[in-house]
Every structure is written in C-alpha cells, then in structure tokens.
Amino acid sequence: MHRMFGTDGVRGIANKELTPELAYKLGKAGAYVLTGRCHKPKILVGMDTRISGDMLENALVSGILSIGAEAICVGIVPTPAVAYLTRKYNADAGVVISASHNPVEYNGIKFFNGKGYKLSDELEDKIQYVIESNFKDVSIPIGSKVGRKIMETGEARKAYIEFAKSTIDTDLKDLKVVLDCANGASYVTSVKAFQELGAKVKVINNEPDGININHNCGSTHPENLMKTVVEEGYDMGLAFDGDADRCLAIDEKGNLINGDFIMAIIAKHLKNQGKLYKNVVVSTVMSNVGFDIALKEEGINTIKTQVGDRYVLEEMRKEGYKLGGEQSGHIIMLDYNTTGDGLITALQIACIVKKSGRKLSDIASMMKNLPQTLVNAKVPDDKKKIYMEDEEIVLKIKEIERKLHGCGRVLIRPSGTEPLVRVMLEGEEQGEIDKMAHNLAELIEVKLN
C-alpha cells in the first residue's frame, strides 16, 4: 500500500495532487475514524493564508459534516493554535490546512487527536483504509443528524493569544522587536501578543494576499529581517514560517540564531529555574556538535533522534522530557503545547532577554557552532544503505573519527529521495574537514559503484 500520509500529514500541489475531492474524502474518513461513536463529535479546523485554503477547507468541512460531525472553523491561525484550541474546545480532533514553509502552490491536511498531538501511523493508515475501501460500512446520517459548521474565528484567535502570553511571567516593555510573519498564519496572533505585552514592535511581511506566503521572507529567508534589525537598531528579530510552528531569531548585530542556539538558551534558562526535567534536551542528529559541547558545560545532556520533529516528540513523550527541537526552529516545549510553537518560542527568547538585561548576542555566545561541511556521494539507490558493510569505508570513518579526537563527528545519511549518500563532517578546522569529507565521499562512490 502506498502511504497517503507523509511525515507531516497529506501534502501536495493544491488542486493537482491535493484535490478538493481528496480533501472531502479525508474530512469524511478522518471524522469517522477519529470520533468513534460520539453522539455529536466536534472537529476543529484551521488554516494558513494560502489561496487554496478556502477551496480545501470547504471540501474538507463538507466531508466532516457528511458524517454527522460538527466542524468548528477557526479561520487563519498557526498550526500550534489548532493543537491548543482542539484541547480548549474539547474537540474530538483538529485539522490544519497548511504546507508549512513550502511554496504557495503546495498545501497539506494534517490531523491532531483530541489531546492536540499529531496522529500515529496506525490512525493515519486507518483513515487511508476507509478511503480506499470506498467508505464500506460507513453509515450516512440524514435529516437532523447531518453535521453543522460553527464559525469561531475571532474568539478562538483571542484565546490562543492569551494562552501564548500566559507562558511568560514578565511584560516586554522597552524591548524593541522586529517580527517577520512570512505573510502567513501568524500575521495577527504574533503581532498582537507582542504588542499587548508592551514591546515596541515593527512588523514585516504581514500582508498576506494568498500568494505571497513564504516568498523571500520568514524563517527560510531571514536576510531582510537581519538588515532591518541592524539598520534600525532593534534588540532582536524573530522570523516565523508560513504556519508559525517554527521560529528563528536574529540578534542585535544581525546574526542568525538558529534552533540549536535557541534550544541551548532556553535549556540553560529552564535548568537555572529547576524546570528542565532530568536536565535533558532532545534534538536530532543534525544538531551541531557545538550544541552538545555547550550544553555539556552547563550540566545538560542531549539525546539524539533521526531528522523530523515527530521523532523528537516521540522521544520526549516516551521519557517525559520537556524540551526538544530541530536546528530549523521547530522547538517543542511540552509544558505549554503539544507541537512546535513559533510564538511560544519567540516569547521565551524575548522573556529571557528582558529578564537578564543582556543583549541576545551575549546570551547566545554560550554556544559556538563548529565548522561543518556536506559532500554528496553519487550511489545507486539499491546500494546506498550498504556502505557500512564495506570494510574499507568503515576503517576510513574510524580513522577520521580518531583525527577529530572528540571535537567533531562524521554523520553519513542515505538520501530518502535521490541516489545519494550524504557525508557530513564537523570539526574545528574548515579546511581539514572539507578535505576529509571529499576523500570519504570519493571512497564511497568508488566502492559502491
């Protein structure tokens, strides 16, 4: 069975791969699977600012109503707001229509369970099975048993803003902040939260027209934000992506503060307050070695997962850890929300700067990124996972690890989509690791071709 669901719901080019017909089926099957035998189940629906959002929302909601469920439509809100509001409204499930940081032609449909967590693979497979079996044995309500659509846009947005503000214990008066909303879902919520907390706020890229989401702006294109912060003398910049589940920061000197730095800063702050469970942070294998070194010096341990925020969250829930995330700015704080939350991340950073009275560049200096290099080895698809079976390659990796003597690492990852093996090295000397990475990639190509 070809899986309909990827790592972040069902995604594709809107009206071509993710069609209104598919959205209708997902709404109908999702409502059926996720609400069980509830008398009048409720499903909360939110979306980002893409032009295709209205088309897909109408189709999705039709599917939900056709099964007898109520659809609570909260309009344009961040993905983490849907996770929070699903809990607040005691909904049986939540759905967000968004393709996150991807270009405008893409869209996606992602489900949350009643507790605000992304669905397990098993539940996603059940939804797919119901669709592929053409809704066999699914009873269709008529008359008064058909579902209703309930509009909750203003109140729901306000509730999320109040919730986000409640996660910090200080105002932000006298703090000068530039927000880059990526012409996306945070264009109201983030701005209002910072303004209501008293910050002096300049906003860029907060005029969504349905087409300009993520276009040369937001967390994937922070160059304009960096320039604005420096030229206009702001304390910091904060960049969100299209659905605002991630956030990156810019210090007062215009330096990018990525997710590794943000996790390190928040981890140290939480540890100092005695709030970092077991003094552990969960990150992915892509986090820089400098992140591990910085946290080790603070008496904080790091646990690594494979790439993807769902794997970070899995590890956190399994062991009860409270802080985790990715270099890309997906930061999960389970004391507050069940998914990466850009606004909560932004508020934590602003709160730490305000309470410390220090510059963000000074706070971020607790960590130094080690130089990093990435070289692709071209390898046939059927051979790219067997590199560890070759003795010469294994010996070469061990030799490089010895040369790095604990101040660097070798990470080798077969590409999931291309005939490539990615060779990533980190170490203290850029020239040295460039040479070692190229030599290793060449050896992998020779031995596996």
UniProtKB/Swiss-Prot annotation:
Transmembrane intervals:
none
Catalytic activity annotation: alpha-D-glucosamine 1-phosphate = D-glucosamine 6-phosphate
Give the residues the record marks as binding Mg(2+): S100, D241, D243, D245
State what protein this is by name: Phosphoglucosamine mutase
One GO process term, biological-process aspect: UDP-N-acetylglucosamine biosynthetic process
Q: Which cofactor does it need?
A: Mg(2+)
Q: Recite the lineage of the species.
A: Bacteria, Bacillati, Bacillota, Clostridia, Eubacteriales
Name the job this protein performs.
Catalyzes the conversion of glucosamine-6-phosphate to glucosamine-1-phosphate.
Give the molecular function GO annotations.
Answer: magnesium ion binding; phosphoglucosamine mutase activity; phosphomannomutase activity
- State the source organism's domain of life: Bacteria
Task: Describe how it is modified after translation.
Answer: Activated by phosphorylation.
| Active site residues of this protein | S100 (phosphoserine intermediate)
Mind telling me which InterPro entries this protein's record contains?
A-D-PHexomutase_a/b/a-I, A-D-PHexomutase_a/b/a-I/II/III, A-D-PHexomutase_a/b/a-II, A-D-PHexomutase_a/b/a-III, A-D-PHexomutase_C, A-D-PHexomutase_C_sf, A-D-PHexomutase_CS, Alpha-D-phosphohexomutase_SF
Q: Which gene encodes it?
A: glmM
Q: Which UniProt keywords apply?
A: Isomerase, Magnesium, Metal-binding, Phosphoprotein
